[in-house]
Amino acid sequence: MVCLLILGLVLEQVQVEGKSCCRSTLGRNCYNLCRVRGAQKLCAGVCRCKLTSSGKCPTGFPKLALVSNSDEPDTVKYCNLGCRASMCDYMVNAAADDEEMKLYLENCGDACVNFCNGDAGLTSLTA
């Protein structure tokens, strides 16, 4: 149940992230951290990011670029790695036995792939 709640919070953050554009990784990190408690407009102003409703970022404001020449496949790859490292590793430690651990890893890995490719829904990881 805790993982479902955390995944829901992460999904909410991603929906917001698609509407904000920052000039740098520092700006993106600032915005993401600020959004934990702050409003979109406030965080965008403080972190020098721009909000857009079109889903396209203006020139000079990349959406998710981690490095200057990154592209979407790299972003999806790093998203999968981060999701698995933060969510799935935690679940492995919570498993009671090897079978439960195997099931958690399989379902969690699938959830991360769906999440990072943009087709995530709120599904239970124990289903």
UniProtKB/Swiss-Prot annotation:
This is Alpha-hordothionin. Thionins are small plant proteins which are toxic to animal cells. They seem to exert their toxic effect at the level of the cell membrane. Their precise function is not known. Belongs to the plant thionin (TC 1.C.44) family. 4 C-C subfamily. PANTHER family: ALPHA-2-PUROTHIONIN (PTHR33920:SF9), THIONIN-2.1-RELATED (PTHR33920). Disulfide bonds join C21-C57, C22-C49, C30-C47, C34-C43. One of its GO terms (cellular component) is extracellular region. GO terms for molecular function: toxin activity. Keywords: Disulfide bond, Plant defense, Secreted, Signal, Toxin. It comes from Hordeum vulgare. Residues 1-18 form the signal peptide. One of its GO terms (biological process) is defense response. InterPro entries: Thionin (IPR001010), Thionin-like_sf (IPR036391). The gene is THI1.1. The keyword Signal applies. It is found in: Secreted. The keyword Secreted applies. Its main location: secreted. Residues 64-127 form a propeptide.
